[in-house]
Regions:
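Conserved ABC ATPase signature
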Residues: 58-62, 66
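H-loop/switch region of ABC-family ATPase nucleotide-binding domains
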Residues: 118-119
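Conserved ABC ATPase "signature" region
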Residues: 36-54
Length: 167
């Protein structure tokens, strides 16, 4: 069952000046989750994001990729109904990007609706079911992903997919 209706993960991970454990479990504490359940979920999630060895160090000491995985896990640990992501893998290495994409796919399969902004066409192809194409803050098209990449209805979307500059 969802503890939080909506969660948001920023492009630049936001860390509390606390340990990895405290950052990860902060939303559970706010939801007044029992301590035993907090410990169980923390153990599960630090394993999933490969941070078990550093669970008690300050989160601010992590690499950018580790911080982003922690920020995502902190959002997902609550089993949100809706997850909003702003360029969650921008400037991350390929390995970390794939790890994050796997977490997102698993969460979507388990019922979380994910809305993600991205400029990464490959990532959109791998993850999206539906594409909302925005240009200068205005919605230009909404299509199922398979159709969007085959037959985009927006001229700007067509240019973007082709790698052209969209003005």
């Amino acid at each position: 069952e969802s503890m939080a209706k909506q969660m948001f993960v920023f492009q630049s991970p936001v860390m509390l000046r606390r340990s990895v454990f405290e950052n990860l479990t902060y939303p559970l504490t706010l939801c007044k989750t029992p301590k035993a359940e907090i410990n169980r979920l923390a153990d599960e999630w630090v394993s999933r994001i490969s941070l078990k060895e550093v669970i008690h160090i300050a989160a601010t000491r992590l690499s950018r990729g580790e911080k982003q995985k922690l920020a995502l896990a902190r959002a997902l640990i609550t089993k949100p109904e809706m997850l909003f992501l702003d360029e969650p893998t921008a400037s991350l290495d390929g390995k970390t990007t794939l790890e994050i994409e796997k977490l997102l796919q698993n969460s979507a399969e388990n019922g979380t609706t994910i809305m993600m902004s991205t400029h990464d066409i490959g990532q959109a192809k791998r993850l999206a079911k539906n594409i909302l194409f925005l240009n200068k803050g205005k919605l230009e098209s909404t299509q199922p992903a398979q159709i969007f990449f085959r037959e985009p209805i927006s001229n700007n979307a067509r240019k973007f997919i082709a790698g052209e500059i969209v003005e």
